[in-house]
Every structure is written in C-alpha cells, then in structure tokens.
Amino acid sequence: MRNALAAVITGLMAVSMAGCGEGEGEGDDAFTVGLLLPSSAVPRWERFDKPMIEKRVKALCPDCKVAYANAADDATIQRQQMNSLITRGARAIIVDAVDVKALRSSVQAADRAHVPVVAYDRLAEGPVSGFVSFDGAQVGRLQGKALLKAMGDKAKQRRIVMMNGDPVSPNTAWYRKGARSVLDDKVTIRKEYANLEWRTDIARGNMTAAISDLGPGRIDGVLAANDAIASGVISALKSAGVSPLLPVTGQGADLDAVQRIVKGEQTMTVYKSFRQEADVAASMAVALGHGRSVHAIATTTVDSPTTQDVPAVLLTPVPVTAGTIERTLVRDEVYSIHEICPANLRSACDRAGLTGPTTKDTKETKEKEKVKGGDPGGVPARAGVARHLQAVRRRPGAPGRGTATPGR
C-alpha cells in the first residue's frame, strides 16, 4: 500500500522551473516554493490558480522553482505530498487543504522544520504563517440577496431549500452564516442539506429528495453554495419537470455555470478573482521563503481552531448575472465571449447582450490598454501586488486590521 501511495504521489508531483532574468526586487536567492492544490475535478485549480501562482513566483523570484502536486480530493495523499515537500527542502509551501483538520499534523511538521505554510482559499489548521481567501460571509450575503431579488417582492412568503457545501470545509459555515444573515426572517427554509465534497451527483440526489418530500410546487428558490452544487440542483429540477426553473444561486464562475446563466437556468454565480488570490499567495510565499514577514502584505488577521491572529488578506467577491458577465469575467480575461457563446448559445448570448469583440480583438484591445498604462482586468499593468494591496486597503469596505473567523 505504501509503495502504491508513493507511486501516486510521485506521479502527481510536477516540478516547473522558473526562468532566469530580472525580478521585481526580491533578489536572486533561489529556492523551492511548494504548491499543493486539492482537486483536479474543479476546473479552476489547474486552469487558473496553478499557472497564475507559478507566473507570479517567477516574477518575484526568477531563480526560484515551483514544485506542484494535486491531491485529487484525497487528504491522505495531500499529507504525503506535503511531507515530501518538507523532506525535499521546500522553503515555503502554499496549500489549499482537502481537509483542514487532517492536514494539521503536516502543517505542524512543516513548522518544526521551519518551513512556513501559506493557507490558500481554505484555512488549514495548525501554525500557518499566512492566509489568503475571499470574504466568505460576503459570498453568502451576495447569494442571499440575489435569491431574494430573483424571488421578487413576495419573498417573505417564499420557501427555499439551502444546499450547503462540504461540512469538512471551514468555508461552508462561513458562506452559510453570510447567507442566513440576509435570508432569516425573509424566507422559510424548508430543507437544508450538506453536500459532501461539493459533488454535483450528491447535490442532485439531495435536491431530488427535497422535491419528493416537499412537492415541486412548494419550493420557490434554492440557495446553492457553489456552481457544482447548482448544476446538480438544476439537473434535479429538470428531471422533476419543474418549469419554469426556480431561482438558483452559485459560486465559482465555472464556465458551464456561466453558460447556464446565459441560458436563464441559473440566477447568478459569485466570481472570486483567481488572479488576485494567486498574486497574494505567491507574494506571501516568496516573502516567507526569503525570511521576511507577511505583515506588510496582510490586511487583517484570522483565527483558526488552533491558531490565532494569522496574517491574512480577504479579497472582495463579485456577483455575476447575465447582465454583468462581460464587464467581469470577459473583462478580466477569465473567459472570452467565444468560449462562453458557442454556436448553440449564440441566440441566448445575444439576448444577454454578449455581442462584444472576438477573442483576438479582446486581446489586442488589452495590449493597447496595457501600453497606455492600464489593465482593466484586475491588477494594474506593471504594478506589483504591494501596490494592488494598498488599493485594497483604501477601498471602501475593504477589511481592515482586526479579527475575522473564516468558516467554507
């Protein structure tokens, strides 16, 4: 069994070497940054987060390398991957924990070996040195507000089903708390489910059970914690013949969810800028690898069940509806209109106002704007993450220094 597990770990561990050249002031001291992501089933991790983190590490530390591994939703494999990075001499590790409690022993082992750990998206237990995520309570509030708006003026008489995330994830409670702060006393929550591993098939089964227990005519909306869960909910509604479909929320800005929004099947999603999160994580890891504090990067502190006052950056999530896809996801180059609008969705895209330039035109426009000194897609052109974080601190409603307790 150990040999088989070692083979899996070796197979999953991919090392990409950053090139040489002038960096952005972090020096030329070469070291390894470990990057451990939780899943290959969720598209964002390997399509967006991995290359963006690698690119930012290279910009900050040209002679550094990134050692990457994906846990494929297996907490045991992730612990072994982390222990391997420690043994191989990684000087800092970025990790999005499959199971925040199960990873505690590996975080403690890293601490004993003087290897700082940056918790990414989910706050791992144990002595982590930094944390970057999005304000989970605000994610839930955005979902709750969108659901109330979609149900209309008579929302107080409406009955909803809450489809929460994986109970193992601390963010699940965080999102739920934010949503309940908006929904309580305004709707009746008829059923509430935990969806293990955020899986679409489990969400479909739970929604099918809710329809069977309550009757399709006695549900007026569904608070789905993320886009994978929303997919299962919508599939169950279709199978039950519910028409028109009910308002259903989401989170993650998955491409198939964006297309469901265009078609009118999903009410909204919540976009969390992969670029911003990746930039902060890479900046923290490189600073820690050079033996520096991350307090200059952090904008707040958070507490886990094991560790208090973890330096953190909690970024601002953005709601996305059919009417805002172009100025959020397309503008940030998450997806092109060509990707969102294949031939079979052209009419729906026209109705949603997605009639902008082609991918080629968009890229040319972006390059022209970068030459002029601006980048509409997130972090300003030629500006480091430090300047971006200063802007975050100045932004109205941005988290200040204090204590927040995360909970997906």
Regions found by a protein language model. Give the residues of each.
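C-terminal motif of bacterial Sec signal peptides marking the signal peptidase cleavage site
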Residues: V15-G19
